[in-house]
Amino acid sequence: MTTTPSTTPTVTTVTDPAGRALDSVDALEAGLAEQQYIADRGLATTLFLALKLQKPLLLEGEAGVGKTEIAKTLATMLGTPLIRLQCYEGLDAASAIYEWDYPRQMLYLRTLEVTGAVERERARHDLFSEEFLLKRPLLQAIDAAHDRSPVLLIDEVDRADQELEAFLLELLSDFQVTVPELGTLRAEHVPVVILTSNRTREIHDALKRRCLYFWIDYPTFDKEYRILAAKVPEVPARLARQICAFTQGLREVDLFKPPGMAETLDWARALLALGSRELHDGAVNDSLGVILKYQEDVDQVRGGVAADLIAKATRAAAD
C-alpha cells in the first residue's frame, strides 16, 4: 500500500497459474471450463471486459445461480487470493474497511508508561501506525502485500445498508481508501472486483455506474446438464437428464423459492447417496427438502405435482 501522491496503480497481466494469457473471450471461457464453471458467452464476454478494462462487475440474479461461485472460480483460475466481504444489514466501516486495535494500543501505552518512555508525539505517531491497523476485506484488497491482483468478492451487497455504498464508491472509483490518521492508501495492484446482488433492493445508480453489469438467469436444460455432468460426473447420464428436466419443471411451478443450480447439484448427490439410478416417487418425495427450502413449497409439490414432473422428466430423458 502507498500513501504517495496519486499515480496509476500497476496492473498485473491477466494470466493463469501456468502463465497463459487470458487475452480473449474464448481463452477466458476455456479457463473457466477447466475449473468446471460453465459460463455462457454473454457472461464470459462481460467478465473478460471487466478484467480488460479494470472495472468492477456487478452480478445480479436469483440465489443459487452461481454468482458467488464465479468469483471463487476466477480466483482459483488466476492463482490469486480471494478476499470476501459478506454483506449484511448493519455492516459498518469498521467491519468492512478497517478499525484500530484498541486493546493492543492500550497495552502499548501501558508498556510505555511502565518503562518511562512516554513521549506524547511519539506515542500518538506509533499508536496510529499500520502496526495497530486491523485491515478488513476492503482494505485487504488494496494491500501492497499482494504480488498480483487479488479477487475481491463483495457478496450480497443488496443486504447491506445504503450507507455502505458510500464507502464503496471511493474504493471502486480510484481503488483507494482514506484513513484520516494515515492518509490515502492506494492499491499497487488493482483488485478484480465482483459484486453480487439478489436484488432484494435496488443498488444506488452511482455505484452501478462504476460497474459493468450482468444478470445471471437460471440455466437452460442443456447448460444445467453440462454443469451437472462436470460437477457430479458420477451421476449416470440418464439420471442427470431426469434431474435437470425435473428442476426445470419445478421452476415453472408457482413456488416461493424455486431451486437454483446449487440445489440441483445437492439433489444429484443426495439421490446417489440414496442409491437411486432414476427418478421415482419414493426417492423424489423423500428428498424434496434438498431442493425446496420452504415447507409450503414441499407441500405443494409432494404427490401429484411431483408425479407429473417425474413423468415429464422421464420422457425428456428418453428423447
Q: What does each model-identified segment do?
A:
Residues 1-319:
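C-terminal regulatory/interaction module of P-loop NTP-utilizing enzymes
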